Amino acid sequence: MNVIECYGLIGDYKDVSSRLPNDALIKRFLGKFTQDQSFGELKAALEAEDTENAFRAAHTLKGVCANLSITNLGADVIEITEKLRGGNLDEARKLFPQAEEKYRMTMEAIAKLD
């Protein structure tokens, strides 16, 4: 799968290509995304009912998704971040399974890059 096909599954290629000038660089940063720990930190903090650390991890992940135009996952992470910003851990936890599925799909798409 090439980068354009990957973005057909995970986000907005036109937007990311306006920030990163070539597909090799986009691919490199997508590789770094797979090593980012913020999703795992978010999951652990939600499980531990740690609103402060969950917010921090969600906010970090939101920024990473925005910078790489990973809009499918990013939309869910924005909602989770805002619930946590308001201190609503239970609502954030309800939204998490959908985000977790999109994260899995994103990771699978990135793994299939040529």
State where each predicted segment sits:
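Two-component system phosphorelay core
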Residues: 1-56, 60-114
